[in-house]
């Protein structure tokens, strides 16, 4: 998946770092530090040297309780800084809620509009439609001055996900191309520390929407509550670790005050890996309950995946009822796809998967024949190989409905390590239907 931002295009299979440049006197952690144009530009260039791909310029504080800034004042703070950085070949983002500011900064060279109000203003939508900048659509309950006044949700994850999906759909219907849109769940914006924590632990649910996902937790107050760190300037280490955890769950754009510390943390990012699971031989089960027995076997195998060393189970698709492929004279399959993050190399991981298969009685006497448990590596982040033991990406992934459908369920728009997009267009066999299960 890529994120198109004017003349820039970012491959979101790897983290993209957005450095925060507040040209404000009252931001919650660095207000006044970069208020002059010279100081702001110097700090931006330092962040680029430290690894920032984008510089996010903000001229209005959106901290809880912040007073609004007049548009004229916000323009005076931001436009010349944006122009100076863009003239040096830097991808610049303008962090603003105001259409006049967004328009002026895009004209000055900004390649991203980062709107904390989520493009609720029709005038901002018109600015977005009329340009080719990348767009960051954020969720915020209320306005900065009042957003922390007792925010209430029935289900914070579902409500934020649905809001972001609706806003993205609205932008597309207004004429904005999908590849320009990035989503930001807005940690700490109209959310308690507990609500924000729940949201951040379930980012994989937002990644299922199929847009690049931003994580913007840097120095946020909820981290102060969770870790007992009162001074925002002392939250950089936990901010970096929280950002790393968010990227492992599916975020791809990291907005941060401390670029160097964040870049260092992201070097510990474990590769993602998609694992296909299949079964058409139930080991136990009463007549008529074979499908549930197959699901149970795959569920146990998924549990085994979650126990792999230096690994984390991130997401699992629904189960799919599948017609046999290649060898058609056999029982129907149940299939699924799991997404993991792992520090295990691909060839060693294959050995672990074979051990799980063997645990459930897998035999390999008939090619493409019946199996109690079948685990295949479909795609391993940034890794391409073709040797006697392993070929990656899986050479038959894109022709099989039973791998394409579940993979796209959990990561719409996924692009394989060799650059091949996963789409339904090349599917020719192994037709699959989602199994509807009710709690």
Question: Residues of each region from the PLM?
Answer:
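Extreme N-terminal starter segment of soluble prokaryotic enzymes
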Residues: 1-3, 15-16, 271-274
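Short, charge-patterned binding micro-sites
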Residues: 61-66, 314-341
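Flexible, gly/pro- and Lys/Arg-enriched active-site loops
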Residues: 325-333, 347-350, 354-439
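N-terminal beta1-alpha1 ligand-phosphate binding loop
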Residues: 271-311, 317-321
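Short acidic capping loops at alpha-helix termini that bridge into adjacent secondary structure
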Residues: 177-180
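Catalytic domains of carbohydrate-active enzymes, especially glycoside hydrolases
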Residues: 42-58, 249-250
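Active-site-adjacent loop and "lid" segments of alpha/beta metabolic enzymes
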Residues: 5, 12, 29-38, 42-43, ...
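Short beta-strand-to-loop capping motifs
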Residues: 279, 285, 338-344, 379-382
């Amino acid at each position: 998946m890529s994120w198109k931002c004017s003349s820039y295009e970012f491959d979101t299979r790897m983290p993209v770092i957005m450095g925060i440049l507040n040209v404000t006197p009252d931001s919650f952690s660095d207000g006044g530090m970069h208020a002059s144009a010279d100081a702001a530009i110097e700090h931006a260039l330092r962040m680029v040297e430290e690894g920032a791909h984008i510089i996010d310029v903000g001229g209005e504080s959106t901290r809880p309780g912040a007073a609004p800034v007049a548009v004229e004042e916000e323009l005076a703070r931001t436009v010349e800084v944006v122009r100076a950085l863009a003239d040096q070949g830097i991808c610049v983002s303008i962090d603003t809620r105001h259409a006049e500011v967004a328009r002026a900064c895009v004209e000055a060279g900004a390649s991203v509009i980062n709107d904390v109000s989520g493009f609720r203003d029709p005038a901002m939508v018109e600015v977005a439609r009329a340009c080719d900048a990348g767009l960051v659509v954020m969720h915020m309950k209320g306005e900065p001055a009042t957003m922390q006044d007792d925010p209430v949700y029935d289900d914070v994850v579902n409500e934020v996900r649905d809001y972001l999906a609706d806003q993205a759909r609205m932008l597309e219907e207004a004429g904005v191309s999908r590849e320009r849109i990035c989503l930001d769940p807005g940690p700490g914006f109209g959310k308690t520390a507990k609500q924000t924590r729940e949201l951040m632990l379930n980012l994989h649910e937002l990644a299922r929407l199929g847009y690049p996902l931003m994580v913007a937790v840097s120095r946020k107050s909820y981290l102060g509550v969770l870790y007992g760190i009162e001074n925002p300037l002392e939250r950089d280490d936990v901010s970096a670790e929280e950002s790393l955890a968010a990227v492992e769950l599916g975020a791809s754009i990291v907005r941060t005050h401390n670029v160097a510390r964040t870049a260092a943390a992201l070097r510990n990012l474990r590769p993602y890996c998609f694992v296909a699971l299949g079964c058409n031989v139930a080991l136990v089960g009463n007549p008529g309950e074979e499908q549930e027995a197959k699901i149970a076997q795959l569920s146990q195998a998924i549990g085994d995946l979650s126990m792999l060393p230096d690994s984390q189970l991130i997401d699992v698709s629904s189960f799919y009822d599948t017609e046999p492929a290649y060898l058609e004279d056999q029982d129907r399959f149940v299939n699924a796809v799991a997404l993991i993050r792992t520090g295990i190399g691909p060839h060693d991981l294959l050995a672990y998967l074979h051990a799980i298969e063997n645990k459930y009685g897998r035999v390999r006497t008939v090619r493409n024949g019946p199996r109690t448990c079948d685990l295949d590596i479909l795609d391993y982040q940034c890794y391409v190989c073709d040797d006697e033991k392993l070929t990656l990406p899986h050479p038959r992934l894109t022709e099989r409905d039973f791998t394409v459908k579940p993979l796209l369920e959990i990561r719409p728009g996924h692009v394989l390590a060799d650059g091949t997009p996963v789409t339904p267009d090349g599917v020719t066999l192994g037709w699959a239907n989602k199994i509807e299960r009710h709690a």
